[in-house]
Amino acid sequence: TGESYAGHYIPALASRIHQGNQANEGIHINLKGLAIGNGLTNPAIQYKGYPDYALDMGIITQTTHDLLGKVLVPACELAIKLCGTNGKVSCLTANVACNLIFSDIMLHAGGVNYYDIRKKCEGSLCYDFSNMEKFLNQESVRDSLGVGKIRFVSCSTEVYMAMLVDWMRNLEVGIPLLLEDGINLLIYAGEYDLICNWLGNSRWVHAMKWSGQKEFVASSDVPFVVNGSQAGLLKSYGPLSFLKVHDAGHMVPMDQPKAALEMVKQWTRGTLAESIDGEEKLVADM
């Protein structure tokens, strides 16, 4: 499980583990499921969704939305297609072309926190993580973690630059095989995150080709209730679940810790979808 760029490395890691298990490579890893929160998985779909989300949330005007859709979105889509066939340089080009969409939206957003549009951006990362950095860089903590003298930073420029080639690649492609073999997938997203917003995530999940796609698309959204209050909207069929989390931004566990914990507990126990079954039974009985 992971969030944000985990939308890339969680599917890749899960696919590799599953492949190794199928081929009896080394020690069998008992992979049961994977979960991604506000992730970037299918850039072609998610970047195209930026203008729609920004318009829906009142960040940009209809005029700006339409201009983005006519000029920058088609250029992004073409660049991503080339990235998928021509390797490294074209993927860097796609990164530049597609992030013009995001940059243009931010230009109109007026200093909004792109991880939580209800807030203003503070510092280079839009959040103050200085206390976390101080804690993790204590010598006693580094010794406990076994990382030696490596200094922790919230965002490593070196790692960021190394991953630019990978950024615009579609990591959804390995997921259908996992679903077909009964490995569970939970995609969840806080509703106020812009950068990896719930709308783009919902769209790639709905567009994904697998044997249960038709049934998943046709299934209804039902309330995800925590302590008697609606904490989100849940959609599920078979091994696939999608949860839009209310009153949360990019970092759901930070914004809604109780809801996040309950989500993970129910999902790992296999009971997250039971609320959907109960809702459908209630409708049928009526």
Curated annotation (Swiss-Prot):
Alphabetized SUPFAM superfamilies for the sequence: alpha/beta-Hydrolases (SSF53474)
Protein name according to UniProt: Serine carboxypeptidase-like
Residues spanning the signal sequence: none
Physiological role: Involved in degradation of small peptides.
Record: residues binding substrate: 196
BP-aspect Gene Ontology terms: proteolysis
Enzyme active site: 4, 193, 250
Disulfide pairings: 83-98, 121-126
EC assignment: 3.4.16.-
Enzyme class of the recorded protein, top EC level: hydrolase
Sorted UniProt keywords: Carboxypeptidase, Disulfide bond, Glycoprotein, Hydrolase, Protease
UniProt organism field: Pisum sativum (Garden pea)
Family as reported in the entry's similarity comment: Belongs to the peptidase S10 family.
Pfam families: Peptidase_S10 (PF00450)
Entry's Gene Ontology cellular component terms: vacuole
GO MF term list: serine-type carboxypeptidase activity
Residues carrying covalently attached carbohydrate according to the record: 227
Source domain of life: Eukaryota
Alphabetized InterPro entries for the sequence: AB_hydrolase_fold (IPR029058), Peptidase_S10 (IPR001563), Ser_caboxypep_his_AS (IPR033124)
